Amino acid sequence: METYQQMNSGSGPRSVGTPQGQYMDVGEMPPMDAKQQTMLWQQNQYMGDSGIQSGATTQAPPSVSSKHGLDDMDTGEGMDTSRMMFDFDQGFSTQAFTQEQVDEMNQQLNQTRSQRVRAAMFPETLEEGVQIPSTQLDPGQPTAVQRLSEPSQMLKHAVVNLINYQDDADLATRAIPELTKLLNDEDQVVVSQAAMMVHQLSKKEASRHAIMNSPQMVAALVRAMTNTNDLETTRCAAGTLHNLSHHRQGLLTIFKSGGIPALVKLLSSPVESVLFYAITTLHNLLLHQEGSKMAVRLAGGLQKMVLLLQRNNLKFLAITTDCLQILAYGNQESKLIILASGGPGELVRIMRSYTYEKLLWTTSRVLKVLSVCASNKPAIVEAGSAGPSMHLGHQSQRLVQNCLWTLRNLSDAATKSSDIEGLLQMLVQLLASNDINIVTCAAGILSNLTCNNQRNKVTVCQVGGIEALVRTILQAGDREDITEPAVCALRHLTSRHGEAEMAQNAVRLHYGLPVLVKLLHPPSRWPLIKAVVGLIRNLALCPANHAPLREHGAIPRIVQLLIRAHQDTQRRATAGSGNTSAYVDGVRMEEIVEGTVGALHIMAREAHNRAVIRGLNCISLFAQLLYSPIDNIQRVAAGVLCELAADKEGAEMIEQEGTTAPLTELLHSRNEGVATYAAAVLFRMSEDKPQDYKKRLSVELTSSLFRGEQVPWGEPPGLDDMDSSQLLPEEQGFRGYQGSGPGSVPSGPPHDMNRQDSMQGLELGSQQGTAYGSHMPDLGPNTDLHFDPMDGGGSSMGGPHTPTDPQNQMAAWFDTDL
């Protein structure tokens, strides 16, 4: 910074440097006395602390001007720097201090230093009226002494709190016996006053600990709360218990003193504060005190909590619903009590009516627990299962996940639901989520909602569901909790609706066939393999899929699975096991046999596929399966032999396996599907036989198939009048041997459960031209082999069915308390 350059008087012109580098002559300025020279000196960089801030002594008078010099001023703002020395003085007092005054001020500051420290650290020790000079120039900037005083103030407050705590504890300890006696007084006025005093004491930590350590006091509070009719007494007693419930010792004392029945009784109180105290105290007990759940159930707390769902206080409802979730989780009796009290309807109403995230989250948790209860499912669906679906687009991830779990649990009971196009579209979109749980739930819900519901199938296909599901399977890798429900959904979408053929082609066009064949190999478990086999069977209904499936090696792998499953069933039968239908990963090997043979049946419609099957030397196995005690296995075995017999070479190989006798026996089967296929195989095998043999066979077929009905055989025009679209099975996930109903499965997502249709229907005409395709016997009127889904009964084809043992059946993966 340029400075004034002072020259001795008479030494020539004096000049001042300016920021612009120009100099002006100040020689003509009037001479300055000593005071003015001192003030001028203070304007430049030599200005120092006079001791007011640092406490150091100095001979310079106190500074009364700014610390800014000329270089800090912007001369470009039009300021006249030539008279700057005098402009500085205009804003300040022109009073000058003598050296004596400066010394006096410094001495005063030195003498009051200890007082300033005492005032900062212990202000209560100062006498009233004493004024102590402060060194704080800026109110926003504390001095060093003030900053150092903060820890001492904290220490002082801690000491004071400790003294007060001890005083509170001593007071409470002395007062508790007397207050306990007053709470037991017969005079309700005395009881009310005592309850108020105890409530006040419970607000302080020391006395609160003293109260909770006195079982007699807590018991007296509970008795007073139970017996009084005075609302104020009830409020104070409930408030005291609420304060105690924030400590584990307090919870234990309340529990042992019988406080839970008294608190449950208060849930009927008309006073808001009493209700709040009661529900929050019960909530704390349910969360942290062992034995509280059973005590609340026995006291009738569930019924009263369900009634409280009609209130409109959002935070109160959030606590109440959380209590219901704690009580219902893992306890079937509690779920049934909530159902009987009308809980599902109220919970769905809350989901529809409010937007408070915490309330929606706690309510969705209750619905998730109730949705695994077979009795509650229909009630929730009837009340409006769309309630949870309203929040699938919510920004709260925990709420979205709970809603999805709930919908997945409910979806097997809502397979007949309609007008859910928006939900289906949202689910397809959620398949693209990065959250594994969301994708898992979305796939499971789609699997259930497309079960035996043509409208839902069409909707999912139209909103890009096929592509989304194939992409999900490709991205899921070995995560079977995702691939299995996704495969099952595709299986439903590829049969029995107007868009089925499009869906069958779409799976191929979106490169789904290679990954599906890959899923037939390890490490896939049996539930997933079973679902994939069913999907491949449906895909084989599309002629364009035959060659790709064959090229990707589907046929040899399916035959390997068939042989493995059959050998397993044979080992159990040979071992003489009492239960010949044991489960492996929740799947019966008989189901795998049925499914694989059914898939081969459909794939054998194509000539090249038939050649591959013949080359795998499995016709003898098909012949053995004709002796199976299970009608559905007999039916699919006869069906695949019927297709293989379409070629002369195949017919000869079948006859060489000695199948004539079992096939003739099956003509008399009570299962019309088995008899029909057996007749078709025998007829095709007789093509090269003498005319007499054909005539005898025709008579045998007529007498066996129509059993006395006067239906004449005509010329053998074939089985063209048997509508193959009617002969398709329902969306079988071949869980028909152990499912508890549509959608209920032992592992993996719920699937279509029709016990009759196993893997396949009676489709007798090969898609490719064969030597016998147009010369098969007319079996008379169409036999409607399409059966409605059954709710857990035996095979509608009359096959033997062993009732499911609940101990052997794995819990459905969507039916668990999560």
UniProtKB/Swiss-Prot annotation:
GO terms for molecular function: cadherin binding. It comes from the Eukaryota. One of its GO terms (cellular component) is cytoplasm. One of its GO terms (biological process) is cell adhesion. Pfam families: Arm. Residues 1-24, 48-71, 732-818 are annotated as: Disordered. InterPro entries: ARM-like, ARM-type_fold, Armadillo, Beta-catenin. It is found in: Cytoplasm; Cytoplasm, Cytoskeleton. Residues 1-21, 48-66 have a biased composition (Polar residues). Keywords: Cell adhesion, Cytoplasm, Cytoskeleton, Repeat. PROSITE patterns: ARM_REPEAT (PS50176). Binds to the cytoplasmic domain of the cell-cell adhesion molecule E-cadherin, and perhaps to other (membrane) proteins. The association of catenins to cadherins produces a complex which is linked to the actin filament network, and which seems to be of primary importance for cadherins cell-adhesion properties. Belongs to the beta-catenin family. PANTHER family: ARMADILLO SEGMENT POLARITY PROTEIN. This is Catenin beta. It comes from Urechis caupo (Innkeeper worm).
